[in-house]
């Protein structure tokens, strides 16, 4: 590199062997963390290439991920005292009448662990809030689910008013038949500022036939396998936005404060995305960055767009023609300028 005076620069630029002149700039190495012995799902979303013997249990990430962001787990409840949550999980609300403030099923605890637990979570510093809408048998009424969504929205709005933790995500790993009322509630929640991930469903059918998978403002998540194929049960179609690991996923569970379990389903894929939303929200560019979004932060619509654009394209097998072939990616703990520049 040469230091050039302004008039010389123009002369040099005209020379036939000069393609372009660029101002010299400092480049910083980004410190990133590698979690060894991580679940394969975390490893997969932090590598562009298919997993190998050297990478299958390594999660590459920014250790600040999740800080200051709240994630609402709208599910069977959460084992909030589990040691993996390190005191970051709290009980929000129990919607089904007469039900206890605990996860008697395990499903919600497993999802919460993928979002923000210490060993199994995408965003390891996230604040987790349990919103119980399903009973211990794993089922519940559509009206209770809608009430749970409304509770999350109100809680988010309350924290925005207080000026703290003003970024919130939500995960809903549940589904049923097509319900315009539920889709409406989820779409309204996203408009109110909640960054929302929902499961595509496990019927190996068009996700547009089910709710909340057909809620267009949310991010609808299909399930992929360790060998980069669509999981045999995963719903598909144009209502699916992205895929994430969903077969044999290790996470937190119930029964003790150290319990774990392997579960499969688009229910396990969706919290990878809720975790990623939480992760990215906490790592938004600072005010001195050229990518600074503004004091209000990134909107759910824009973050959804960036997340999909930044995903790894065309690596999954058995994806029907009308379904986006995109696998979630976290940036491997490196510089995220490409993510914010989308």
Swiss-Prot record:
Positions annotated as active site in the UniProt record: 75, 107, 267
Enzyme class: hydrolase
Record-linked CDD domains: Peptidases_S8_PCSK9_ProteinaseK_like (cd04077)
Disulfide links within the chain: none
Function: Serine protease.
Glycosylation-annotated residues: 137, 171, 335
EC numbers on record: 3.4.21.-
GO terms for biological process, alphabetical: proteolysis
One Gene Ontology cellular component annotation held by this UniProt entry: extracellular space
Similarity comment text for this entry: Belongs to the peptidase S8 family.
All residue ranges annotated as the Peptidase S8 domain in the record: 39-342
Occurrences of domain Inhibitor I9 (ranges): 1-30
UniProt-listed Pfam families: Peptidase_S8
GO MF annotation: an example: serine-type endopeptidase activity
Positions of the propeptide removed during maturation: 1-30
Record key words, sorted: Allergen, Glycoprotein, Hydrolase, Protease, Serine protease, Zymogen
Source domain of life: Eukaryota
Protein name, entry field: Subtilisin-like serine protease Rho m 2.0101
InterPro entries, sorted: PCSK9_ProteinaseK-like, Peptidase_S8/S53_dom, Peptidase_S8/S53_dom_sf, Peptidase_S8_Asp-AS, Peptidase_S8_His-AS, Peptidase_S8_Ser-AS, Peptidase_S8_subtilisin-like, Peptidase_S8_subtilisin-rel
Species this chain originates from: Rhodotorula mucilaginosa (Yeast)
